[in-house]
Amino acid sequence: ITVLGKMPCELNGKDKQKLGVTLSEAGFSTYLNVKDIIRILKKLYYDFDEGEFRSRCDRLRIPLDKNIKDFSTGMRAKLRMLVALSHNAKLLILDEPTAGLDVDARNRLLDMLRDYMEKRPDSSILITSHISTDLEGLCDDIYMIHDGNVVLHEDTDVLLDKYAVLKVDEAAYEKLDKTYILKTNKESFG
């Protein structure tokens, strides 16, 4: 695996400036507020865009003076994403970035990612998500991984055009041509 054309162990400080990362449980001390984080980001990233960061905080209703320890799970998730987007990274690595967000916040965040990619066509996003609809409008390729193995790799357009999820009762399932079924999941309800 290479990152920005290099082996990970070869990345230098300047290369790492080009990475934006969100992890589900990582970040700043919870005793800091967003204004404190802005001061840190200005020192960490030479390309930190404070104006855009503040604007995004405002759009996602992230208070600047409140300590992170008093943030909800969703507010913390939004802040992690805004930090990743704050310094014009060439590669975003996002682990479940919309987990814990309500539908409105999730859609706003996805719009920000789409906007980010439109303004930076030479950038890439590596994103993990259990919410497949989050991926449809963002990704060119989708990899499905199960137990550490790639079980499906397909262009997003092909995936949307040629694959589907069917929810049927047992009688309808028995009538289906099983040749085209990749996976089944029996549920106890509905």
Map each language-model feature to its residues.
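Catalytic Walker B motif of ABC-type/P-loop ATPase nucleotide-binding domains
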Residues: 92-96, 101
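N-terminal cationic-hydrophobic initiation segments that often serve targeting/anchoring roles
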Residues: 42-45, 83, 117-118, 136
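Helix N-cap at the start of a conserved alpha-helix in ABC-type nucleotide-binding domains
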Residues: 103-105
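Conserved ABC transporter NBD signature motif
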Residues: 1-10, 14-15
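Conserved N-terminal glycine/acidic-rich loop preference
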Residues: 20, 63, 71, 77-78, ...
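ABC transporter nucleotide-binding domain
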Residues: 110, 114-126, 130-190
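A short, proline-enriched helix->beta-strand linker immediately N-terminal to the Walker B motif
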Residues: 85-90
